[in-house]
Amino acid sequence: MSNLYKIGTETRNKIKKFRTSTARTDSIKALSIKIEPKPSYEIIVDEDEQEELDEIEDLSELAEILPDNSPRFVLTAYPTTTKDGFKQTPLVLVYWKPMTVVSQEWKMLYAGALEMIREECGTFKLIEVSSGLEDDSDVEELREQLENC
């Protein structure tokens, strides 16, 4: 069976490096993953957004960095402290799909690639964000979901 999507070696290596480098991080880290348009449909790390994501200090900054007209996958390392006082940094895949995405093609492409990306990133924790994080309550809801992973 032929696959519509392709993940190159460079992208695989970047995901692997992100996973290992964020295992004990004390700050939020995020890796933006997107699908290239026709004809390749290659899954790549979005370098333009990545520079800004490397500087992120709070979840509310995601809305300013991520596009409001295109979906993304954001592999996120979110450090938390458990009730027992242990520090942990779970990897969570955030499926960014703002309500303003009008292209049915993009919605279908990202929905179809979701399981492939989850498997490649090695996480089964998934949070779908469709609010655009415009309100403080949206950011707080995302924060709670990340802390409960």
From Swiss-Prot:
It is found in: Cytoplasm; Nucleus. GO terms for molecular function: actin binding; Arp2/3 complex binding. Keywords: Acetylation, Cytoplasm, Nucleus, Phosphoprotein. The keyword Coiled coil does not apply. One of its GO terms (biological process) is actin filament debranching. This is Protein AIM7. The gene is AIM7. It holds the Pfam family Cofilin_ADF. It comes from Saccharomyces cerevisiae (strain ATCC 204508 / S288c) (Baker's yeast). Present with 3040 molecules/cell in log phase SD medium. One of its GO terms (cellular component) is nucleus.
